[in-house]
Design a protein with these regions (language model features):
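Short Gly/Pro-enriched turn/cap motifs at secondary-structure boundaries
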Residues: 23-24, 57-63, 136-140, 146-147
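Short SAM/SAH-binding signature in class I
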Residues: 256-262
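Cytochrome P450 core scaffold surrounding the K-helix E-X-X-R motif
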Residues: 43-50
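Glycine-rich beta-strand-centered segment in the early N-terminal region that forms part
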Residues: 25-39, 52-101, 106, 114, ...
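Glycine-rich phosphate-binding loop and adjacent beta-alpha segment
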Residues: 214, 265-278
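Cysteine-cluster motifs in flexible loop/terminal segments that predominantly coordinate metals
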Residues: 90-153
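Mid-domain Rossmann-like dinucleotide-binding core that forms the NAD(H)/NADP(H) cofactor-binding site
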Residues: 85, 146-147, 153-155, 159-247, ...
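Short amphipathic alpha-helix with an adjacent loop that forms part of the alpha/beta core around
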Residues: 245-255
Length: 278
């Protein structure tokens, strides 16, 4: 039977998050219902409230970085049992489409419906207000909800000793930031790297660049404590402006500039991208 619990949702945009009582459906085939233990807070969640990121269904439950414990499993659903610890991925991976089959699960066909708020294969949701109104789930998850019924395509089982309050961040900020340096940026040993914006994603980009062996990691952020944190995480330099970073990079590369430039600014504008090529 459905579970009554609380969520934090936006009724329209621009708007504010508010607490609401919701009904969470039983899981169907290839779905699980999870008791949320921890959720991250991503800048994308704020973009939902401001309207910078439009969505297809209002009200809309926020949150896409989360981890919890499986409370129930849908019929004929394989790979999960009640009590399993899971971490959510904001990008689903079906394992069947062309992209998943060729090792590019970040491009899974299911990702096209991330912000619709509904299921991948029909216009319904698994979350409703008490009057029956459908509530959209961010990335098909909605980790700001105490319980969430989600497709198994969005859940990864993790070891029993996993600390979920830490692991919840793996679903977006770690994968996005680390991946921007290691996978997309393809940072190599000895490279000079500039990273603009040291929030959750930028901080992980710093760590990814350091792990990949970059000789010089230049973090750019106007906020002092973020620059300090970047250096704690391995950045060799931390400056306030892209102009400063560019001059430092040129000094290491005989005037050529950075080998890799990563933009992880919360609200990215064309000039930020242009500066990355300077």
């Amino acid at each position: 039977m459905s579970i009554t619990c609380r969520t934090s949702l936006v009724r329209s945009a621009p708007g504010k998050y508010e607490t609401a009582t919701v009904e969470v459906d039983d899981p169907q085939q290839d779905e699980i219902r999870v008791k949320m233990v921890a959720s991250g807070l991503c800048h994308s969640d704020d973009h939902i409230a401001t309207g910078d990121i439009p969505v297809g269904t209002y009200p809309f439950a926020g949150g896409h970085e989360g981890a919890g414990v499986v409370e129930s499993v849908g019929p004929n659903t394989k790979g999960f049992e009640v009590g399993d610890k899971v971490v959510f991925s904001f990008l689903p991976a079906c394992g069947k489409c062309r992209w998943c089959a060729t090792g590019h699960s970040n491009l899974c066909d299911l990702g096209a419906g991330l912000l619709a708020g509904t299921r991948w294969d029909d216009p319904s949701t698994r979350l409703h207000l008490e009057d029956g109104t459908n509530v959209g789930q961010m990335c098909g998850i909605g980790t700001f909800t105490e319980y969430a019924t989600v497709a198994v395509d969005s859940a990864i089982k993790v070891p029993e000793d996993t600390k979920l309050e830490v692991a919840c961040l793996l679903g977006c900020s770690v994968g996005t930031g680390w991946g921007s340096a290691v996978n997309t940026g393809e940072v190599h040993p000895g490279d000079t790297v500039i990273i603009q914006g040291i929030g959750g994603i930028g901080a992980n980009a710093v760590q990814g660049a350091v792990h990949a062996g970059a000789a010089n990691v230049i973090a750019v952020d106007p906020v002092a404590f973020k620059r300090e944190k970047a250096q704690e995480l391995g950045a060799t330099h931390a400056v306030e402006s892209i102009e400063e970073a560019t001059e430092i990079a040129k000094g290491f590369t005989n005037g050529q500039g950075a080998d890799v430039s990563i933009v992880t600014i919360g609200v990215t504008k064309p000039e930020h991208v242009g500066n990355a090529f300077a």
